[in-house]
Amino acid sequence: ELSLFAAGLQDLKACFGYAPQVLAITGTNGKTTVTSLTGQLVARAGKTVKVAGNIGPTLLDTLTEAIAQAQVQVEQEAAERAAAELENPDLLSEQPLVTTAPETITHAQDEPASEAADTTDTDEALDSLDEEDAAELPLPVAPAVHDPMAQALPQVWVLELSSFQLDSCEGFEPTAATVLNISQDHLDWHGSMAAYAAAKARIFGAQALMVLNREDAQVMAMRPEPVRVKLQKPVERAAVLFGGDMPQRPGDFGIEVTHGMTWLVRALEADETRRRRKDAAEELHIQRLMPADALRIRGRHNAVNALAALTLASSAGCALGPMLYGLREYRGEPHRVEPVAIIQEVEFFDDSKGTNVGATVAALQGLGADRRVVVILGGEGKGQDFSPLADPVQRFARGVVLIGRDAPVIREALQGTDVPLHDAADMQAAVAQAAAIARSGDAVLMSPACASFDMFDNYGHRAEVFVQAVASLAEAAGVAMEGGL
């Protein structure tokens, strides 16, 4: 399907000069969140966008629909022009051809005042981005577009792609692409981690800007070695890095913790007028973009997801100011560390989509950064190695409640920790037990690291049962379920 989609874009370019920005996302975990958020940021910045792929709807269905919509728009505009020309024959000839050109990143202070309806500390932080901080990512150069069909089609495509789609694709060349992370998954299909990672790496094509998670060694290994040319400086593949730590290169994104506050930041080149010695370290200016607490999606891992989306949308020429407001508005995807309720100062989270070890590790690290967590684990383990859970459980968990068929396997993997391990017969019992273990300020996280089919119809059904169990606790405590944000 991906090869056919790529061929379709090539045909549209040949026929109409259509050259959209294509932003592609893959990774073991976080794909849907980053895809959805990137699409929202692009739209918030005023560009027309289509989101498709593994997230749904399919690539070809969405492309077919976009072409049909564009044809209708072009026909309507042609009819309107013809009617106007009949009324005033000189009107059309006096109007210049309309062209579009790539936009550039503008400053956060360029956001209209009407966007800042609520006066908060976050608004002040966004508005404090001054002109000297207005560095721009290198943007792809697109030709001016004259054909009405090309103008009517989306300016940007945001695609969520799986390893299965990428494994056999040909001719796919996105503008920018990311592999968010790599951990064990789908090894029954790919045969090995090396083959799985190689399939993911196909997303970059030959020329795409590589948006890389610098905290994932397997992702960083996907960047090719510089091409060495005789008597010339080695040529590096264009890349922008993001991660949960401080950025170390101009243009990269990261997280800064200062005076107890966590910020999303970008590194900019220091004052270029101050020439440094040839062997001196590169000087950076850290631009604070917004407090991480202003995000509605919770956890450090989601702050990193936000940085990935911000980097991708920036590469398509989206204005920074509107995107930062878009980040604050995004509420997240269902069953992905989704807040459910706060009961007696304990917050409950539904992460039923956490069906593999990597997803649960990320959720524990994300929520555990500022609180202790009681985690509900277990289900159909898919033959995974659960040992990577031991470290985050040891660091962040107050207790573990085990359910499902592979609970004994997970117990064995966590036996070396000093965190109490409890067994529960079903989800209702697990929620009640987790609530009893949790203390004020803690989180109860249902992130099973397993598939759901041993006890439930699917992960959505598992989430529904979890939410019902939390609702029963809330009712007994006299708390409304709206307590979750």
Residue spans of the language-model regions?
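General beta-strand structural signal in soluble alpha/beta enzymes
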Residues: 1-2, 25, 50-53, 157-159, ...
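Acidic, Mg2+-coordinating active-site environments of NTP-dependent enzymes
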Residues: 12, 18-20, 45, 61-156, ...
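ATP-dependent carboxylate-amine ligase
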Residues: 36, 43, 312-321, 325-335, ...
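Walker A (P-loop) phosphate-binding motif
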Residues: 8-57
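Short hydrophobic/aromatic-enriched beta-strand-loop microsegments
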Residues: 1-2, 176-182, 230-242, 372-375, ...
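Carbohydrate-associated surface elements
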Residues: 166
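Short, acidic/turn-prone active-site loops that include or flank metal/cofactor-
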Residues: 2-7, 54-57, 78, 182-185, ...
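Short beta-strand segments
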Residues: 24-26, 160, 181, 213, ...
